[in-house]
């Protein structure tokens, strides 16, 4: 059943401090927009986030595609922008290995993701050990709480993440009510009857385009929110060729928020 509670109501009862913070932020800023900023230079990355920051609750990064990445030059300014504009950070790492390996991938290497990213995500392909490994890395790397999303469904054409795979991934998510805060999915993932309040974040959302020729399939803001999405993830729709990030950021922010108000009966 699609949740119709407000973000504030959900924050008050959520077991995860990360989810609580995110829900409160969304309500305060009146936005459920996550900007997916996939660009190859630190300068463009930070410039886009500066423009989009006022309109988003989250920025989604693929930090490993930035050619000139450095912790001091890329992450430190990103954290400053997050503080300035009051948004959280989601590194779209899609971990998919055994627990011991992902623990090292999350905490170490060049990127040290657990030190700076509020939220990350993982596939369920290797079982529940991946949740345990990532949680241990989070606890050992940062005093700040961290949250994990499981990849239950994908927006790409021909995706294998459906049916039994999705159901098994949901079962893995149930292994840690505090650390696993929700899913990357196309619809509500249930769990309410068992006391879970999962956040659903949905990529492949567009107000104009239907696809990109490389397998991405777009759905409208109203379509995804009506079927259970809490946060809309938008990338090229915000800053693709010929688009003004400030104009599009406001446009998608307003569309997402109005869809949320309709769903909760507030509009």
Curated annotation (Swiss-Prot):
InterPro entries (UniProt xref): Aldolase_TIM, OMPdecase, OMPdecase_AS, OMPdeCOase_dom, RibuloseP-bd_barrel
Catalytic activity: orotidine 5'-phosphate + H(+) = UMP + CO2
UniProt entry keywords in alphabetical sequence: Decarboxylase, Lyase, Pyrimidine biosynthesis
One GO CC term on file: cytosol
GO biological process annotation, one example: 'de novo' pyrimidine nucleobase biosynthetic process
EC number of the protein: 4.1.1.23
Keyword match Acyltransferase: no
Pathway: Pyrimidine metabolism; UMP biosynthesis via de novo pathway; UMP from orotate: step 2/2
Segments traversing the membrane: none
Protein family: Belongs to the OMP decarboxylase family.
Protein's name according to its UniProt entry: Orotidine 5'-phosphate decarboxylase
Organism: Debaryomyces hansenii (strain ATCC 36239 / CBS 767 / BCRC 21394 / JCM 1990 / NBRC 0083 / IGC 2968)
């Amino acid at each position: 059943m699609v949740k119709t509670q407000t973000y504030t109501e959900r924050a008050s009862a959520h077991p995860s401090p990360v989810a609580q913070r995110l829900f409160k932020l969304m309500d305060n800023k009146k936005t459920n927009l996550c900007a997916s900023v996939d660009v190859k230079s630190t300068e463009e990355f930070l410039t886009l986030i500066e423009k989009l920051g006022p309109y988003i609750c989250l920025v989604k990064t693929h930090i490993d595609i930035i050619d000139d990445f450095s912790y001091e030059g890329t992450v430190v300014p990103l954290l400053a922008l997050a503080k300035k504009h009051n948004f959280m950070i989601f590194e779209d790492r899609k971990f998919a290995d055994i627990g011991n390996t992902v623990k090292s991938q999350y905490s170490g290497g060049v990127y040290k993701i657990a030190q700076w990213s509020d939220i990350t995500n993982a596939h369920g392909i290797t079982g529940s050990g991946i949740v345990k490994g990532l949680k241990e890395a989070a606890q050992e790397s940062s005093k700040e709480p961290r949250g994990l999303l499981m990849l239950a469904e994908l927006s790409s054409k021909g995706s294998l993440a459906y049916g039994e795979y999705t159901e098994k991934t949901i079962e893995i998510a149930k292994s840690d009510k505090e650390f696993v805060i929700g899913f990357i999915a196309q619809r509500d993932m249930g769990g309410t009857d068992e006391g879970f309040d999962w956040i659903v974040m949905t990529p492949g959302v567009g107000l104009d385009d239907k696809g990109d020729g490389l397998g991405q399939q777009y759905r409208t803001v109203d379509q995804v929110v009506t079927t259970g999405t809490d946060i809309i993830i938008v990338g090229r729709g915000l800053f693709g060729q010929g688009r003004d990030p400030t104009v599009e950021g406001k446009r998608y922010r307003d569309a997402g928020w109005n869809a949320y108000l309709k769903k909760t009966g507030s509009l």
